[in-house]
Amino acid sequence: MEHRVIYVLVLVCALTLSSLAQGQQETCTVAPHHRDNCGSPGITPSQCKDKGCCFDNTVRGVPWCYYPVAVDNPPEEECPF
């Protein structure tokens, strides 16, 4: 009986975490001074994107290959009908 309770608790926690993760998306719209470096100097745009990162070389003195940031999805509106 104890194993079933533990199993149910683990299942509930896993489902809760997965639903929270689905509520977020990532964006490459990051202020240049807030970028967290994701690559080494000289990384190409394709190498950067292969790592799952963003590439923007339009601003000097900041990382060109950087991690995207998570943004919350707006809550879905319920259909009134």
From Swiss-Prot:
Cellular component GO terms, alphabetical: extracellular space
Compartment list: Secreted
Pfam families referenced in this protein's UniProt entry, alphabetically: Trefoil
Record-linked InterPro entries: P_trefoil_chordata, P_trefoil_CS, P_trefoil_dom, P_trefoil_dom_sf
Residue ranges constituting the P-type domain according to the UniProt record: 26-69
CDD domains: Trefoil
GO MF: growth factor activity
Superkingdom field: Eukaryota
UniProt keyword list: Disulfide bond, Growth factor, Secreted, Signal
Disulfide cysteine pairs (residue numbers): 28-54, 38-53, 48-65
GO BP annotations listed: maintenance of gastrointestinal epithelium
Signal peptide: 1-23
Purpose: Stabilizer of the mucous gel overlying the gastrointestinal mucosa that provides a physical barrier against various noxious agents.
Name of the protein in its database record: Trefoil factor 1
UniProt gene name: TFF1
